Every structure is written in structure tokens, then in C-alpha cells.
């Protein structure tokens, strides 16, 4: 996707390109921190917050745009995918008991995951055919993000536990995706000849939906973590009595 080659941008964008670069670095760093923190927390807690269905969609998105439509700077996508392999392993190994308590289900979970990746890759390719690669890159990425945010919030409420998750994981993914959205709207303003498509009601709705879902997630996580900490303190007091 040559559209992401910012060296070809008009002069008015070049003057403020450093701001776009900062947002891109923050985006890349945020999600790398999220991935590494997810792997570390999963092995510490023997649980993983990452829902498998959104993860398969995200992996398909990375595969499609790494192999078929690589943007300039695509090594970061490749690095994301490499680290994501650790997230995949963690999510499959420490899948919630409801998804892995049956031996047959647990045995075929990796196969089902691969099939899901193939299905989502088909969807991303269809989106590219309808919208062209550049818009599909962002709309597909936001679809993955909203699935992740909604499923993570649902899992947090359903399990009533913060095991497998952390403030670092939540905050880093919020910072990463917020930087991606800020960069997108920034380019739509300063480079409208190529990026005006991003300044529309649907993209603003996607941004708002992400903010609401992950905002509610943060509040619910704080409430559960506070309750868990209080239970730990109460248990310690009972042991000393």
C-alpha cells in the first residue's frame, strides 16, 4: 500500500509529519506492550484475557496485509504477528474452562482456530475488494478491535475475575488503538486528497464504540480488582487472628 508512504505526502503534511510519526510509534509500542504483557500475565495467572474469536480475526488481518498488501514499514506488522504467536499459544493453552473442559473440544481447539483465521481472511479480502486496500486496512483493523473490546468486556463480566488480565494490558491497548485513530483523523485533516475517506460518520462511530467499550472495561476491571484486593486483605487478617 503505497498510500502509507508518507515521503510522498504534500508539503502541508510534511510540515507536521513528525506528529504523525509520534502517533505511529505510540501505536506500534502500545500493542507490542499489550502482546508481551498478555503472554507474561497468562503464564503467571494460568489464564488469558484474550478471546479466541477476535484473536483469530486479528491474526487473519495481519496475515493478509503482511503477505498480500504490505504497507511501507511492514516489518512492524511482521513483528506484531511474530509476538502474536505467543499470544495465540497462551490463549489456546489457558482457554477458559467453559471452552476447554471437554477433552474433544480442547483437542480440536487449535484446528478450529486455524479454520477461523481462514474464514476471517476471506472476510478481509472481501473488504479489500469492496473498499480498496487502504480503507480496508483501517476498517478491518477497527472491526478486530471492536470484537476484541466487546468480547473482553463480556468475558470480564461473565467470569467476575481479573485473572489473566492487567491494567498494563488494558491501558497499552487503549493507547495503541487511540493513537491509530488519532493518526487517521490527523491525516484526513492534513492530507485530504488521499485520506478524506476516513473523515466520516462510520469511522467516528467506530471510534466512539471503542471508547465506550474499553472505558466500561476499565471501570469494571477497577471494581473487580479492588474487590479481589479487599478479599485478599480480609483473608490475611483472618489467618493472623
UniProtKB/Swiss-Prot annotation:
Pfam families attached to this UniProt entry: Pyr4-TMTC
Cellular localisation: Membrane
Molecular function as annotated in GO: lyase activity
EC top class named in words: lyase
Membrane topology qualifier: Multi-pass membrane protein
Keyword Transmembrane helix: yes
First-listed, main subcellular location of the protein, grouped into a coarse class: membrane
Enzyme Commission number(s): 4.2.3.-
Null allele phenotype: Abolishes the production of 15-deoxyoxalicine B.
GO cellular component terms attached to this protein's record: membrane
Record flagged with keyword Transferase: no
GO biological process: one example: terpenoid biosynthetic process
Note: The 15-deoxyoxalicine B cluster is a rare cluster that contains its own geranylgeranyl pyrophosphate synthase (olcC), in contrast to other related clusters which rely on a FPP/GGPP synthase localized outside of the cluster.
Protein name: Terpene cyclase olcD
Lineage of origin: Eukaryota, Fungi, Dikarya, Ascomycota, Pezizomycotina
